[in-house]
């Protein structure tokens, strides 16, 4: 497995593969890899001859300096995991490589509307940081296909819109959320939870499934439903941050025409912000998501 931290040698290798007619898949990560990331890698392998991954903790997408400082960095372990998955190349740039003139002078990519609603409203600039770094990584790696987790539902929608708007020649593949045995969505931030917090963390997913069962049962008083869900979170000492019920296609308020909705949730458990989402088929009558 090749490991490059500089752009030029990576580009030379990419050019070689392109000349050989190889199809290239790309999985961008911020490291601290878990089974969810490895599922992205395996999915990428199904779509291409060559798999490239990146490990870069992107300072542009952090609103909180402490959050950036405390983000887990486990480069050696990450490289071992990627090696075991037979990744062909890993790109490990520093902030100085990605933003040589500093963040203030960096050209940015801003996807309107979708970057400022929902989570974007409470984290101004976050999605601009995401779209900028992903666009730059696409320009560097030149992938034919890129894989992203559906756990970050709004981020995936943002990237898909950016690819359309910028006419980027890359296929975007969404990969279903990977969960722990107790239902908690896998996340690098889970490592920051104390033992007690980790035991309470699955309440987020359970509450989300409860909302889903209520919706599929015909309940559509969404504001009241969100309040009830917030109470469930607080009862388990989780602090609700955001709970949205939106049309899964538009991310706008559901209408009578909405057949597929998405529940978007975020809550603080101690100092850790957990996120999750669940798509709900409003025409469905089964209750297989219930506890």
From Swiss-Prot:
Keywords: ATP-binding, Cytoplasm, Ligase, Nucleotide-binding, Pantothenate biosynthesis. Pathway: Cofactor biosynthesis; (R)-pantothenate biosynthesis; (R)-pantothenate from (R)-pantoate and beta-alanine: step 1/1. It is an enzyme of class 6 (ligase). Coiled coil: none annotated. It is found in: Cytoplasm. (R)-pantoate binds at residues 61, 155. Pfam families: Pantoate_ligase. InterPro entries: Cyt_trans-like, Pantoate_ligase, Pantoate_ligase_C, Rossmann-like_a/b/a_fold. One of its GO terms (molecular function) is ATP binding. It comes from the Bacteria. ATP binds at residues 30-37, 149-152, 178, 186-189. It catalyses: (R)-pantoate + beta-alanine + ATP = (R)-pantothenate + AMP + diphosphate + H(+). GO terms for biological process: pantothenate biosynthetic process. GO terms for cellular component: cytosol. Its EC number is 6.3.2.1. The reaction proceeds by a bi uni uni bi ping pong mechanism. Catalyzes the condensation of pantoate with beta-alanine in an ATP-dependent reaction via a pantoyl-adenylate intermediate. Homodimer. NCBIfam families: cyt_tran_rel (TIGR00125), panC (TIGR00018). Belongs to the pantothenate synthetase family. This is Pantothenate synthetase.
